[in-house]
Amino acid sequence: MTQIALTIAGSDSAGGAGIQADLKTFAMHQVHGTSVLTCVTAQSTVGVFEAEPIKLSLIKAQIDVVAADLKPDAVKTGMLFNSETITQVTQRLKHYALTPLVVDPVMVSRTGSKLIDDQAITCLQEQLIPLATILTPNRYEAEILSGLKIDNLEQLKQAAIAIFHSSGAKVILAKGGSLAGTEQGMDIWYDGKSIKTLFNRTVTTQNNNGTGCTLSAAICANLALGQDLWQSVVNAKKYVTLALENSLNVGAGNGPLGHFFPLLKSD
């Protein structure tokens, strides 16, 4: 039987992030990938130059036909662009009871740049995030969701706990990257019972565009394959590290991960 995963996110014309990264990740996990497009960007490795949302009726139609016919085994959300899109997506997820749900709360880039407005952030917090099986904020998104400043590992832990108790999400995976006082990358897992730190070797590369998208997509793919939540996160972290180690040196800026690294020819 073929497992099916669904990504609800935006398009990256450079192929490094968004649904392009998600579908590559699904394919690498031998999961059939389906997609609902929420916005289109004119994007290269050096930045985003233009973006337009998909009209709400078409977003609804995409979710309806995929959910009714293909019945995804797991779902992830990424860039939802504005509050109207967030509301539409939330309503359809509820209508079809689509779970497990990985919510990548795309609000702030990994460098700290805001990606959606305050109204959309509030909408995300009030409507979509409470449905999440697992929520995967980066450091800056965790600061917004918790109201806490994060400069070290202990503060990241406190933020994860605060987000859990305020958000309604079943599990928080707060992504710390390389924080002060640490030589490794780390994420914090909190499920209301135990708090765990996941360490990984740091990969030094400028070709890291789409890292967050790839992680949430890999978690989603593992869930679709029937792995439990913790093992899905562990497997996804390993996959992202290997994809970073085999990232692609393309374009003038931040290139993409090597999603298909076992298939890549060595130089």
Which residues make up each language-model segment?
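N-terminal basic/disordered segments at the start of proteins
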Residues: 15-31
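Short pre-catalytic strand/loop immediately N-terminal to key active-site residues, enriched for Gly-Thr
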Residues: 8-14, 195-209
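Charged C-terminal helix
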Residues: 53, 230-267
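Nucleotide and nucleotide-moiety/phosphate-recognizing core
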Residues: 87-96, 170, 189, 194-195, ...
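Conserved phosphate/ATP/ADP-binding segment of small-molecule kinases
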Residues: 118-195
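Phosphate-handling active-site elements
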Residues: 30-34, 195-196, 222-236
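Short, small-residue alpha-helix embedded
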Residues: 20, 143-144, 205-229
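Conserved N-terminal subdomain of the carbohydrate kinase-like
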Residues: 2-7, 27-103, 107-110
